[in-house]
Amino acid sequence: WKMSQSERLGKLYASDCSNGGIAKFAEPCDETWDANRAFFLGRWCDQHNIDLVVVGPEVPLAEGIVDELTTENRLVFGPCKEAAQVEADKSFAKELMRQASIPTADARSFSDIESAKRYVLRGLDREFESEGKEELAAEISKFMDEVQSESAGGTEAFSTELQSILSQREEPCVVKASGLAAGKGVILCQTIGEWLEAIELIMQDKAFGEAGNRLLIEEMMTGQEVSVLALVDGETIWVLDLCQDHKQVGEGDVGPNTGGMGAFCPAPLLDEEMMGYVEKEILVPAIDAMRRNGVTYRGVLYAGLMLTPAGPKVLEFNCRFGDPETQPLM
């Protein structure tokens, strides 16, 4: 809709015109993106004299559509495959933020379920023993030994008493699938029992598919959540109006996360001074860190922020326009 208003536009094509709103403004593209058949989409672009491609979803960006379609005569708006890892791999993004001293939640990354469970249960055996709960301490120790040897069952094998204690032991955290999960791979946990359930759901049950081959266990931050989107050409940053989207499915911010239930902008939650802080301390350092690693970032850099009492901290980076944030932005 917005691109169709450009005075410089010749013809506008969309990869999917099954949406009636899109079909009203664009003609259908006969080829779709497939990482294993990139040549065919490139050839279609050549045949139709396409000189600008704007990529919306994160999956094609992570698969390298920008690298495949960019030519001397054709620009592609979006980051290259390597730069898109800032969204495609949450563990990569956390390490990038650590390198650049970008404020974010403390987190640990795990590539196997055994290490994740050991991290969650660390020290509980000694704690139970000091409280005189020798049987529970022995049960935890046995489970940890079995986890070490990869012979442990699921947490359903715990005694009823231990399951009850873990389900009531409040330690809020966030468990995230490291890969792309359409905005749904984040589980908010309030107890240690929920930590373990989330780990098994992601890494054992593969609730989010291959996105759960790695996961993050992250401290839970509290505050208002906002979205800051910026246009980047590799060096210059143009920060757009502040947005706020609402992800949880239920009224009053309850229930599991979705890709987005709705959004509005401009959100009156950060003043000009604080927006300057976000640009200087979050956006610029992220782009500079990638440049130091030999990666030039171009396209949209989206920072999902939590406005904590200690200031804005990064929840996630996305490598594309947010949906639904882009709708009120336009």
Show which residues each predicted segment covers.
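Conserved ATP-binding module of the ATP-grasp superfamily
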Residues: 103-105, 127-175, 189-227, 284-294
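Glycine-/Pro-rich loop/turn segments that contact NAD(P) or position catalytic residues
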Residues: 70-74, 81-126, 161-172, 186-189
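Short, intrinsically disordered, charge-balanced linker/junction segments flanking boundaries
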Residues: 105, 328-330
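General beta-strand structural signal in soluble alpha/beta enzymes
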Residues: 14-15, 54-55, 76-79, 97, ...
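ATP-binding N-terminal substructure of ATP-dependent carboxylate-amine bond-forming enzymes
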Residues: 1-82, 87, 92, 135, ...
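Internal nucleotide-binding/catalytic subdomain
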Residues: 185-328
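Short, well-ordered alpha-helical microsegments
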Residues: 61-63, 116, 225-226
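Acidic/polar active-site rim loop that often engages polyanionic ligands
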Residues: 74-77, 96-103, 177-185, 256-270
